[in-house]
Amino acid sequence: MDADGSTTDASQLGITGDYIGGGHYVLQSSDGDAEGSLASGDHDESCGSKDPYREQDIYLPIANVARIMKTSIPSSGKIAKDAKECVQECVSEFISFITSEASERCHQEKRKTINGEDILFAMSTLGFDSYVEPLKQYLQKYRESMKGEKGINATVVTTTDAIPEELTEESFSGPLATSIITADGQQQNVMVYTTAYQQIPGVQPIQFT
C-alpha cells in the first residue's frame, strides 16, 4: 500500500499521535515529508502537528549507560557513540524482557505487585542463572538496610515520647517571691513558680553563660 493509502487508513481509524505514543513507533523522514509518516487528517493541521514518539524516550539516560560502561575499560579508553547507543537499547530491551516474565508470574498468582523474588524467578526461568545468586545476596542486604533505617526511625520516636506532655504539681519547685506595682501605684506580692529540670535521655542540656 502506498503512502497516501496509509495516511487515509490512519485517519479513518482515528490513529493520532497519542495512540502512536502508547507503544507504536514512527520513523519520520529527515525532509519532513508528511506522506512518509502517519497523520491524523485535518485535525492535526488545525491544532498543529505533534512530534512523533521517539524510541529514545523509553531508554535509560545514555550518560548513565556510558558511565557504567567506562567502569569496565581502562581510564585511557574511549567508547564510540554507536557503541553507547547499542548498549543503551540492549539494556532497555533486557529490562522489558525480565519484567515481562516476572509480570507473567504475578498474573498467574493473581498478584498486582512485582517483588524481588519475581525478578529472581524470571532471571532463572530465562536462563540467567549466573545472575540469580549475586542478586539474591544484594536483595537480602537491601532489605536488611531498610530494616535498619526503620529501627533508627523507631528510636527517634521513642525518645520523643519520653518528653513529658503534662506538668504535675511535683514538677514545680523553688517558688520565688517577688512583687509587682499595680496600675493604682500599690505594691502587691506574688509568688512565681519554676519547673524542676528533668534530664531527658539522649538530650544534652543547654549551658547558659
Curated annotation (Swiss-Prot):
Stated family: Belongs to the NFYB/HAP3 subunit family.
Comment, domains: Can be divided into 3 domains: the weakly conserved A domain, the highly conserved B domain thought to be involved in subunit interaction and DNA binding, and the Glu-rich C domain.
Span list, region B domain: 54-143
GO (cellular component) term, any one: CCAAT-binding factor complex
Region (Disordered), start-end ranges: 31-52
Region: Subunit association domain (SAD), residue numbers: 87-98
Protein name: Nuclear transcription factor Y subunit beta
Pfam family, one: CBFD_NFYB_HMF
A GO MF label: RNA polymerase II cis-regulatory region sequence-specific DNA binding
Stated role: Component of the sequence-specific heterotrimeric transcription factor (NF-Y) which specifically recognizes a 5'-CCAAT-3' box motif found in the promoters of its target genes. NF-Y can function as both an activator and a repressor, depending on its interacting cofactors.
Compositional bias segments (type: Basic and acidic residues): 41-52
Localization of this protein: Nucleus
